[in-house]
């Protein structure tokens, strides 16, 4: 009769300092299908090491171990996991049930790693628990079960994938006599159903219930009677659950890992929340800085555009502050006319300015008076609250009219509903108010400077007595490149003057500089926020490393029932990613709350969340989980199942 399990000259030794300590010495043993065998020996005799080798949890240092004719030494770790999953079932002295799972969920674990469909494995788990007398304890956690009930759950788990070979390590060691007798009766029933049952014990009363007793002492077998051939009942062989295809197994294990991750988070709510806190703050910082920074950037650019978009200012001299008398009269009215004829010009306005006293009744204020054309307000995109600008006839006739800004109107006419038509004194010259320019809001606040505008002809001839212009402002048509327009403008005036006695100031360059500056500042703040995200990620890695240490025994249990190293890696990696994703979602919610509060206090800001910002937050959370979860997950996957099971 061919042996199901066969060991030939198997030895197992472990390093101890510079020496090797032999635990098993030249063990040769055959166990046939359907046998009930007891391996007995005192503590330290090597019986547990022998059981670990029989269950493919450990490998011999030398010798050969075959399972159904297959040499175990030729199998890779995944093949060994499959062998444990499909052929072996473990029953431990301390039950080794996962405390955060129900009885049924504990029983299902081997089927999860076999890729069995959820409904099928749930039905089989309930069937096994019913057979073992636990139909009313299916949804109970281990803490609500007695020792005997927990051991029966452990037996059901061993049978989940068929359990052709049942390895029981001191199965009654932690039970009272009555529960112990019940467990032994179940093991005898399994033997009668065709299972091969191997019991490791030091209790001679337990060993006596086996068909064959193998005694081990100091790593050597000292008593090994021959196997007895015994006729079994027909039709009671161990039921084997067919495993699912690879893709289904992966999907099932992924869902289970996701479920386990969620249960692990729920089991330690406070620790999970504190772990997430770093991610929450990091993601909230990144998203808030991106969103609020973009709103601030748009506000800054809007303020710059309010000063005149697509505009080019022309000033006499070489640069600002140049008071050389030969350049003072460089710009003439004819230059303005020539500029207005250019096809790329939308509008152009001259400018002369002077400080004046403006009086109305007993109110006397100082203002900055600007002599401009009617196109000035179009050039700077200004609208009117009352009245309108001056027309070409008023400019030609040097009309004594004035446009006030909102601040000047409040100072001169605090109690008047309509001021158009009112007469004020500009210096000693009476002028009629024909319009009030609309106040333009700004993130920097509204200017307290008082401004008034008169026709440039009135300002030049009647007030200042000069024929030249202080500056010309040109608005370029939409779609025309402002840099090229500036070059053509420079060429035109240089040809007219015969020399370059002026300089230009392109507002687009200011806009571009502001965009670059705000982008740099936003990038810097984002990097600061990313640092907080990295700190949060390190916190996740630290807690996950602690979690791996705390759950070492759980990892050993999962490996014993058939989990591959990749399954363990996947589970802990998913846990880290899930912590970061939930933290990221809470971080986005926090950033939305921050944005909402800012919107209340800064109603002029347009704060909005783009898909790019939200997608970036999601990717950041996922990447953080993968990056900082990899090391703990790898450490978990590299654990030796024997060492993991031995830890408390």
Curated annotation (Swiss-Prot):
It is an enzyme of class 7 (translocase). One of its GO terms (biological process) is response to antibiotic. Its EC number is 7.6.2.-. The chain crosses the membrane at residues 273-293, 417-437, 523-543, 577-597, 611-631. InterPro entries: AAA+_ATPase (IPR003593), ABC3_permease_C (IPR003838), ABC_transporter-like_ATP-bd (IPR003439), ABC_transporter-like_CS (IPR017871), MacB-like_ATP-bd (IPR017911), MacB_PCD (IPR025857), Macrolide_Exporter_MacB (IPR050250), P-loop_NTPase (IPR027417). Residues 5-243 form the ABC transporter domain. SMART domains: AAA (SM00382). It is a multi-pass membrane protein. The keyword Nucleotide-binding applies. It is found in: Cell inner membrane. It comes from the Bacteria. Keywords: Antibiotic resistance, ATP-binding, Cell inner membrane, Cell membrane, Membrane, Nucleotide-binding, Translocase, Transmembrane, Transmembrane helix, Transport. GO terms for cellular component: plasma membrane. One of its GO terms (molecular function) is ATP binding. CDD domains: ABC_MJ0796_LolCDE_FtsE. ATP binds at residues 41-48. Belongs to the ABC transporter superfamily. Macrolide exporter (TC 3.A.1.122) family. NCBIfam families: PRK10535.1. Part of the tripartite efflux system MacAB-TolC. MacB is a non-canonical ABC transporter that contains transmembrane domains (TMD), which form a pore in the inner membrane, and an ATP-binding domain (NBD), which is responsible for energy generation. Confers resistance against macrolides. Homodimer. Part of the tripartite efflux system MacAB-TolC, which is composed of an inner membrane transporter, MacB, a periplasmic membrane fusion protein, MacA, and an outer membrane component, TolC. The complex forms a large protein conduit and can translocate molecules across both the inner and outer membranes. Interacts with MacA. This is Macrolide export ATP-binding/permease protein MacB. It comes from Salmonella typhimurium (strain LT2 / SGSC1412 / ATCC 700720).
């Amino acid at each position: 009769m061919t042996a199901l399990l066969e060991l030939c000259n198997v030895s197992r030794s472990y390093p101890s300092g510079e020496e090797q300590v032999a635990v098993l010495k030249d063990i040769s043993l055959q166990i046939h299908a359907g046998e009930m065998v007891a391996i007995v020996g005192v503590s330290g005799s090597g019986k547990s090491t022998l059981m670990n080798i029989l269950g493919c949890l450990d490998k011999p240092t030398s010798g050969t171990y075959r399972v159904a004719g297959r040499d175990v030494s030729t199998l890779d770790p995944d093949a060994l996991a499959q062998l444990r999953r499909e052929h072996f079932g473990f029953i431990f002295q301390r039950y080794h049930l996962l405390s955060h799972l129900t009885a049924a969920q504990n029983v299902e674990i081997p089927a999860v790693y076999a890729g069995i469909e959820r409904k099928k494995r749930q039905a089989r788990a309930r069937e096994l628990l019913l057979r073992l007398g636990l139909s009313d304890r299916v949804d109970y956690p281990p803490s609500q079960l007695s020792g005997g009930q927990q051991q029966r759950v452990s037996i059901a788990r061993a049978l989940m994938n068929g359990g052709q070979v049942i390895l029981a390590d001191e199965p009654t060691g932690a039970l009272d006599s009555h529960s112990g007798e019940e467990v032994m009766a179940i093991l005898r029933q399994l033997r009668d159903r065709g299972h091969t049952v191997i019991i490791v014990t030091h209790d001679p009363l337990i060993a006596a219930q086996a068909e064959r007793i193998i005694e081990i002492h100091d790593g050597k077998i000292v008593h090994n009677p021959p196997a007895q051939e015994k006729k079994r009942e027909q039709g009671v062989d161990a039921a084997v659950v067919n495993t699912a295809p690879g893709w289904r197994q992966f999907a099932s294990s992924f869902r289970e890992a996701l479920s386990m991750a969620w249960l692990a988070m729920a089991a330690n709510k406070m620790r999970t929340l504190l772990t997430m806190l770093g991610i929450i703050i990091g993601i909230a910082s990144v998203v808030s800085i991106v969103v609020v920074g973009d709103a601030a950037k748009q506000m800054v650019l809007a303020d710059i555009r309010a000063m005149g978009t697509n505009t080019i200012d022309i000033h006499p001299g070489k640069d600002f502050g140049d008071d050389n008398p030969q350049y003072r009269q460089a710009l003439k009215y004819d230059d303005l006319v020539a500029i207005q004829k250019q096809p790329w010009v939308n509008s152009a306005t001259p400018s002369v300015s002077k400080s004046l006293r403006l009086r109305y009744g007993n109110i006397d204020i100082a203002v900055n008076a600007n002599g401009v054309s009617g196109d000035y307000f179009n050039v700077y995109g200004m609208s009117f609250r009352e009245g309108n600008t001056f027309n070409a006839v008023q400019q030609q006739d040097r009309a004594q009219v004035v446009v006030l800004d909102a601040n000047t109107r409040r100072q001169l006419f605090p109690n008047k509903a309509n001021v158009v038509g009112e007469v004020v004194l500009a210096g000693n010259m009476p002028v009629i108010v024909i319009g009030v320019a609309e106040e333009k809001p700004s993130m920097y606040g509204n200017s307290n400077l008082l401004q008034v505008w008169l026709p440039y002809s009135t300002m030049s001839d009647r007030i200042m007595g000069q024929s030249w212009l202080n500056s010309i402002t040109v608005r370029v048509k939409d779609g025309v490149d402002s840099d090229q327009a500036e070059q053509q403008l420079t060429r035109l005036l240089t040809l007219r003057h015969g020399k370059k006695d002026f300089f230009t100031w392109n507002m687009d360059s200011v806009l571009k500089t502001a965009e670059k500056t705000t982008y740099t500042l936003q990038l810097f703040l984002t990097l600061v926020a990313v640092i907080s995200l990295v700190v949060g990620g390190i916190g996740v890695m630290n807690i996950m490393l602690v979690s791996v240490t705390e759950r070492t025994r759980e990892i050993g249990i999962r490996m014993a029932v058939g989990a591959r190293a990749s399954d363990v890696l996947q589970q802990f990696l998913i846990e880290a990613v899930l912590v970061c994703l939930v933290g990221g979602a809470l971080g986005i919610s926090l950033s939305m709350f921050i944005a909402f509060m800012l919107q209340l206090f800064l109603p002029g800001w347009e704060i909005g969340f783009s898909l790019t910002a939200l997608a970036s937050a999601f990717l950041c959370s996922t990447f953080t989980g993968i990056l900082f979860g990899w090391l703990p997950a790898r450490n978990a996957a590299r654990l030796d199942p024997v060492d993991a099971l031995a830890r408390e």
